[in-house]
């Protein structure tokens, strides 16, 4: 498996990316997670690189079209169920990053919509399981903040979310 951006600095050409993927394939990679944004290695901070270079989903779609034998997973700026549905028409999978970190409960909503699951856990049930996990980990010496800092978004957009974050 390899994860890469579609280009860097002044290089965002289909042939360059396709050749790079072929080299990785020849080395044994079968799954490629393609972030649909090039990386600006000079002039932008890592934080700026999260938003400033434009997303180019079509290049990822074209890579899949030219390489149907490879598993191509698209990544970059994806946060809504309709976006996921659309990308799945052209790619084998979707990787969601920041939006899941900001609102982890959206994974339950995505699972319900995409996979038609039933009996999905409520936020409260997720919080209860989290507390059980936290209790076990604290007994093993894990610091509370090492876990809790990744869960502040569990009640994202809900009444009382500020209390959860505290």
Could you describe each region identified by the protein language model?
Residues 1, 39-41, 62-63:
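A short alpha-helix capping/helix-coil boundary motif
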Residues 2-6, 33-38:
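Short, structured patches in soluble enzyme cores that scaffold and shape functional sites
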Residues 8-10, 14-22, 27-31, 55-74, ...:
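Alpha/beta catalytic cores of nucleotide-metabolism and tRNA/nucleoside-modifying enzymes
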Residues 36-50:
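Glycine-rich, proline-tolerant flexible connector loops at the mouths of alpha/beta enzymes
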